[in-house]
Curated annotation (Swiss-Prot):
Organism: Mycobacterium tuberculosis (strain ATCC 25618 / H37Rv)
Species lineage: Bacteria, Bacillati, Actinomycetota, Actinomycetes, Mycobacteriales
Upregulation: Up-regulated in response to iron and copper.
Membrane association type: Multi-pass membrane protein
Disruption of the gene: reported phenotype: Disruption impairs growth under conditions of limited iron avaibility, but does not affect virulence in mice.
Protein name: Divalent metal cation transporter MntH
Amino acid sequence: MAGEFRLLSHLCSRGSKVGELAQDTRTSLKTSWYLLGPAFVAAIAYVDPGNVAANVSSGAQFGYLLLWVIVAANVMAALVQYLSAKLGLVTGRSLPEAIGKRMGRPARLAYWAQAEIVAMATDVAEVIGGAIALRIMFNLPLPIGGIITGVVSLLLLTIQDRRGQRLFERVITALLLVIAIGFTASFFVVTPPPNAVLGGLAPRFQGTESVLLAAAIMGATVMPHAVYLHSGLARDRHGHPDPGPQRRRLLRVTRWDVGLAMLIAGGVNAAMLLVAALNMRGRGDTASIEGAYHAVHDTLGATIAVLFAVGLLASGLASSSVGAYAGAMIMQGLLHWSVPMLVRRLITLGPALAILTLGFDPTRTLVLSQVVLSFGIPFAVLPLVKLTGSPAVMGGDTNHRATTWVGWVVAVMVSLLNVMLIYLTVTG
């Protein structure tokens, strides 16, 4: 009897410990889930109107041929974004701050100038994308649509300023899900053939134009302002933990954060190309985003077309606010200036409204804005790999040697592809 009692006590004790372990696991998972968010804000840059233009053009012209480029670009981008967030967590500095600390004033001013031009080019693309969506949905003139996009993006930034980063992350994540629904809704009507999709994962090109579009996809995917921004987002959200278990845990959560966010962004980009390949191949009216909308309307119906336009609008609104946020972080980090967000919003909105008012082709302007962004890629990615591979900067959290080598390969490859994009665009 005593033996049975001891056995029962042992089982109860063991069950209690298992229950405590399960409770701790649930608490840990709940806490880890709460810590997700910064990467989802940065991921908005990967589903902006520039991506829509590049992916739709690729699918309409070459079908599934360049699907592998989207996959490769998103894998590269995931590594870059993780390194950016890691820098912010470990050093307590954003990438612009870490770079500016190592420069004299003239060099910092020059570096800020190129970064600011890139941020403004980003904003032009986002505002134009939102204006196109509003014209599609409500037949509004492009300048009016641009103003509305700018005002709404300012309201989103006001949430971040007055209610904190966590609520801002939730709103942006919700918009990311709207974008995902908008560009994947067509798969409920018709799905691409699996063999064709698998064939698109085999790396290959088909003439010079496919190389240009591949470079455009890469240029629209790895965005310099997202690289600058993510380091600051991670620092502001998680602080600057001391070396030890807490830092290791936050870095682990950050890997999950980046992985999930980039999986969604990559899936949306792939969906854009697949929708175009499935429904727009061979049509002559898909050279513009509006043409793509009409093609979706004709082949899949009004409901799917409206969801496509809603996805585009959410893309323009969310990415415009994120772009302005990145610009403010760049200025603060390099020049230690803090400009009121309203003033900054008006300054960056000016070029976009001028382009829309003067009657330039909006889709062509979107493509050219990606070329301007291409100039900024090396200035963001190369210093990031160097800093995160430096023991003097990162201490015991320096990149593993293999990670650093892969980072250099990715940085050089992305930079060369963007140089190729610039050359091919300039030479026609």
